[in-house]
Amino acid sequence: DLVRSRGLGDVYKRQVGENFYANVNLVILDGAKVRIGDNAFIAPNVGIYTAGHPLDASDRNKGLEYAYPITIGNNVWIGAGAIILPGVTIGNNVVIGAGSVVTKNIPAYSLAVGNPCRVIKRIDE
């Protein structure tokens, strides 16, 4: 299933796998491609943001921004209120705890929590 959205004259894509479920208030800011795998479950109030702005105020004031793709693997559960930031890949069979801020890649078969999000346990294959 491929969904296209239009923004600022460009076409961006969100690709969603089979048996995907998202609860209320999911926000996907798709300045770059977002891929969500099969059997992915997303709790309420999750934000998936591909876009960001420079730290330097003069660059921000020029209207500069960046966007990096996000990939969420198969059999992933993302807890309520989690935030997924630009450029992140979440591997297959991962659980992201509620309220986590995912700033870096999370390897497959992991339980990851916190701000910033970090792996606290391996989930057996």
Per-segment meaning from a language model:
Residues 88-91, 106:
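Extended beta-solenoid/beta-helix repeat architectures
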Residues 4, 86, 104:
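Conserved coupling/switch loop of ABC ATPases
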Residues 96, 114:
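Conserved G/P- and acidic residue-centered "switch" motifs that form tight phosphate/ATP-binding loops
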Residues 1-12:
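Single conserved hydrophobic/aromatic residue that forms the stacking wall/gate
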Residues 10-16, 21-89, 115-125:
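Flexible, glycine/small-residue-enriched loop-and-beta-strand segment within the central core
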